[in-house]
Design a protein with these regions (language model features):
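N-terminal intrinsically disordered, cationic/polar leader segments
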Residues: 1-31, 41, 45-108
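Short, conserved glycine- and acidic-residue-centered signature motifs
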Residues: 32-36
Length: 108
């Protein structure tokens, strides 16, 4: 199962962590995994490359985990929150369609 955690800090999303494999299908044919990967890459690329936010991104191949953490001060906070909220809504819709393969939660 893929586990997605959005970090909540005072009502704003301060980052996310995505880990695990969905197990929906074999590697290369797993539409759940492909959808999660696309949402994560879109959000991370938009935040760092388009908006220019110096977010910290860590990838742990052994744990199949990617974590993105925003800096404490962010000039384009509204845009970043819109991107992360869109990512969260997209992944929640995916979870609703495939509840056995992905979980999405907000953590403090």
């Amino acid at each position: 199962m893929t586990r997605v955690e959005f970090f909540d800090q005072d009502g704003n999303i301060s980052g996310f962590s995505v880990s695990g494999h969905s197990g929906y299908a074999e590697e290369g044919s797993d539409i759940v995994c492909a959808s999660v990967t696309t949402a994560v890459q879109f959000a991370a690329t938009t935040i760092t490359d388009v908006l220019g936010v110096p977010a910290k991104t860590k990838v742990n191949e052994e744990e199949a985990r990617i974590t993105l953490t925003l800096p404490n001060v962010c000039e384009d906070e509204d845009a970043v929150q819109a991107v992360l909220t869109g990512m969260m809504l997209t992944l929640c819709e995916l979870r609703d369609q495939y509840p056995e393969y992905i979980e999405v939660m907000e953590v403090q």
